[in-house]
Structures are given as structure tokens and as C-alpha cells.
Amino acid sequence: DQPRSRGLGDVYKRQRELDADAALEVLAVAVSALHAFVQLNWTGPDLSWDAQSLLRSAAPSSFPPRDPEAETDAELQNAMQAASLEFLTKQGEPAYHLCEAPVLLVFALLVLEALAKHSAGVRLPSLVWWRVRAAAVHHRILDEPVRTGSVLDTLGELAGRLGRAAAEHADEADAWRHLQSRALLERGLALQREGLERDASELFVAAAQANGLEYELTGAPGKRTRYQKHETTQLVLLAESRGDGGSGERAADEASAKQPTTLALNDDTLLEHTEFTRTSTTSRLAHLDPGAQPPLQPTDQCVLLALCLNIRNTQPMHGLTTSEMAAFLERVLAHARNWSVHTMGLLLRSRLEMQRTRTAERATLQLQALVDQMPTADSHVEERLRYFHALELEPRWAMQAELAEQYATLGVLRSALEIYGRLQLWEDAVRCLALLGRAQEGIELVDDLLHGRKVEADVVMQQKRIATSASQVRPEHFSSARAAKLWCLLGDLDVAHAEEHYQRAWDVSQRTSSRAARSLGGLYFAKGEYRPACEWLQRAVRINALFVRSWFMLGCSAMGLERWVDAAAAFRKCTALDEDDGESWNNLASCYLRMDETQAARLEAVERAAEDDGASLASDDASTASADTTSTARDSGVEVESDADEPAPAAPAAGGGGGGPASFHTF
């Protein structure tokens, strides 16, 4: 510990002496570490060096001497892995425990944060952008989404500065507008991860306008099947980039000949692509042939993919939504301009095609091909990373888990179980065991993991069909956040002792597990014990406020206690997270009907004050979670007192009469 402290002290001392050039070099080192982490866990190919050797060579005095007889530095690697994962736990949500070299991400986050606090960081306009990117990568390895925080607002300010620079420098306006488009797009993706789809949609449209992308979703006559004789109107996306559709990007992106493998449909009825007939139209894109449109800039392709995701997130999943998304994907996949962009397009197409019998086979094989290509070096690293931050590309383990989910959908449960076991995604593995009629085996699996019972790997393979030796790991090797999730999973499975297991999860996490608090709140809510349900759900939303169902149950519990102001605050948060939640709107109206003027005025005043102060979720997980006192919605901008001092009734009225809620929807 002492050598390590001296090493960090030297680093901080040097940071105080940075000049502009040195600050830029430090930023470059942080970005390199961030991209090395991304390369290992997202884009591939695998690196030829490991983080432990690199850190040892950079600061040998900060690490204990290595055993010369050992083939690998396993002890140091395990210690760094555990410490890094503990650092990356945020708002009670653990990072994926099998991610590669998390110390690289920790290093990047710490260096970027130190630069932001240093006076030299002011002279680095792009520092804000890289902090947002690092935070986005961090949040994408967490089990559940969390708030990004105020750093997103600074990226919005940077986008505004880029727009003004485009207006002031006419000769370089295209370059400035391109940067503005990227900033708007990445901010929109971050908001979309938090569930703010409406705000994200506006940013995606603004990104398209900034980069000069023109697009229109329209209809054109065409044929979709091989034996179709008469043309019918087909949905098509007409899109055109500014200028020649590539400018300086074209040579850079098309120079790489290797692109992700696109599997053919090979169906005896459906055509590979819709055959369109050119027809006259009055739109600005009337000059485009629907079946032979020009290539798009890769950035414009990223915008269209983001809009496609936004359609899925804001509309119910039915045939019309699928057709609309397919039109966007067909336009992007028509021209392979970049490895990562094309991979993202193929991934989204696979998700859509899994819903149809005729295309499910290609969807599964295509996803398998995407998983297999990750570790290969068949394309340049620069090309894979160039547009990574402008995409919602899944990490390696998430794509493998998605493949397992497709196997499970097709009924290939044993293959799905093998993948889940290899990835140590125990919740999904237990679900597969239940579908195989082996629910008790799932309970035993989780219990073995928590209590560290020794089971040989070959026994695990034979008896539980899971090719992993993770069950040999003793409990102390689990991080507190991960152990808490396992206890919650055991509570889900062992219903008779659920409350005991959830409480154990809360204690193990040192009062930082949103999952445990949500589970306890839901358990008491199902029992009709609304007072403890309110307390636990309030703890849950203070730690992580992005779960609509937690807010909804909190509002219903407050209605059961006739605390109308608290209930209204919770339902307002529900409607802010999901504007189409009709039950929350209904219950919100019911709360307002039962509030007197003083209560309504207090609610409005508190919300306005919170909005003026820019209230948001506190980033310190431990401090927010360890408090025993509860508040309705700290990060929703609402903090109110109880409506009455006298004890509230223990259960709500069932109908609309009397003093009970007019609409009490529990699900």
C-alpha cells in the first residue's frame, strides 16, 4: 500500500505542474486506455499485451514483486480485477464481473476527472466530450441503467459552441457542423439509455439537420415476394447526405475492403430486397431511385440507426413498427461504409427478423457470425473505433447473451444454458433451468454460489450442464454488489424465505443495492403492507431512479396510505419517464382530485424550486443509500412531507367510493 500511495502522490504532483502540451498528452493517454478497454470488450480484435504488464513497466515500485516461477501474474490480476469492479459499481449497480481489463477504464476515468479539476483542463475543449464518452462506456457495462449526471449538460453546451463556430467560419462550416452532429447524436444516445426517448428523439433530428442529412419515410410501388405479379405500395426510406455523401470520409472508410459478413436470406418466397418501381413524387427527394439510392456518410448512417432504435423505444412492438424500422435498416445496410456501423445495422436487423418464422434462421446465423467476428483482426482497429461512440453497439458478452436468448426462443434451451453458464449470467441460466423443468436445480446452483460449496468443474458440466467452475469461488471473492444480486435471485426463487434473502442482500450490499430495496418494496406491496413498502421503495428510487415500476408501486402504496401529495409526486415521475403510461396518468388525476388547494400548491412549489436548483440524483451511492430517513423523490425534483400527522389507514379502499383512490392499478 505504501509504494502505491507514493506512486499516486507523484502522479498528482506532476498533474499540478501540467502545461497545455502536457495536458494534451495526458488526455491522449486517457483516451488510449479508454479505447483499449473498448477494443477488448466491444470491437476487438484482442490486444497483444495485458494491462498488468503495462502498469508494472510504467510504475514497478508501485506493485509487489512478481513470482518468477509463475506463468501468469494471477494474484495481482485478481486483486486489480476485484478492486476495479468495486470502483466501477455505481448507484448500487455492479459492473459485469467478467469484462476484460476493467482497470483500463478505471485509469481513464480517474485521469479524465483529474484533468477536469486541473487548470490545464480548461484549455482542452474536447475534455468534456471525452468525459461523457468515458461515462457512457462505464454505464454500458453496468447491470442496469443509471443517471449520467451534469456532465451531459456540458456536452450540450459544447454542441452549441460548435454550431456557433460553424456560423462564424464559413470556409470550415461543414467540419464544424459534422462535429456538432456527433455531439448531439452522442448526447441523444446517453439520454436514450436513461429512458428519456422523447428528448433523445429531438436530439437525433437536430443531429441530422446539423450534418445536412435529408430523409423521408414514404411509400413506393414494388414487389416483396418472388411470385408477386402486381406491385403494391412498400414502405421505403429516402435519404441523402450533404454533398457527395462521403467527402473526406469516403476514402478512409471504403479503403478497408473487409466488412462484417452479411448472410443471404435464401428464402423460396421472400426476395432479398424489395424491388421498387421508380415513380414520380413531389418531395424534395423525388430525384432518388428507391432501389438505387446513393451511399450515405457513416455519421448519417449512425443517425438513422439511432432513429431506428428510437422508433422501437417509443412505439408498441407490432407489424407497423417493425416495417418502419426495417425501412431504416434497409437504407443503412444498402452500403457498407464502416465495420462498426454495418455491424450495428446487422444486429438490429437480426432482432427484427427473429419475430418472423421465415427469417428467424438467418437472424440466428447472422448473430452467430457477428459474435464470431469480434476477436478476429480482419479489419483495422481505427475503423472499428471511429464511430463506436455514435452507436449503441453491444459488448461481447451482451451479444453472446442475445444469441442465447434467440436459442431459447427457438427452443434450443440446452445451448442457451451453456452460453449463460459460460458468461455466468445466473439469472438467465436459472430461467433456462426452469424451462427445462429443473427449477430446484436452479435454486441449488445459486445457493452453491453464495455459500462457496466446492463442486468440480466436470461434475458441474455433467450434472448441471454448465461448463464453468465459478461455483468453486468462495463468497468473499464476490463483490458486495454482485453478492447482493445473487441473494435477490435466491429470494425470487425461494418464495418461502424471500423476505429473509432480500434483507440479506440489502445488508450484504451495505445498503447500496437498489435491486434489494425494490424487491423488498414489491414484496410488502404485494402483501398490502403499504407503510414498509413506501419506505423500501423510497430507498430504491433514491439509489436508482430510472425504474418506472418502482415509482408506480411507490405511488400506489402512498395512495393506500392516503398520502396524496407523495403519491402524486411518484406518479409524476412515472409520467416523466414514460409519457404513454396511461395508468400513471389516471392515478395522478385521482390524486389531484383528493388533494386540497394547500397540498397542490405545496407540490407545485416544491417541484418548481427543485427544477430551478437542477435537482438530480446524487452520485455518492453509499451516502444516499445509508440514510434511514426516506424522501419521496430526491432526484425527481420533488421532496414533500406527509399529508397528515395522524396514522394513515393500513390498506386502500378497493373502489372509487369513500376515501380510497378512484383508480388503484397495481400492475
Name each region found by the language model.
Residues 1-12:
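Single conserved hydrophobic/aromatic residue that forms the stacking wall/gate
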Residues 197-204, 257-381, 387, 556, ...:
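Long, acidic/serine-threonine-rich intrinsically disordered regions with weak helical/coil propensity
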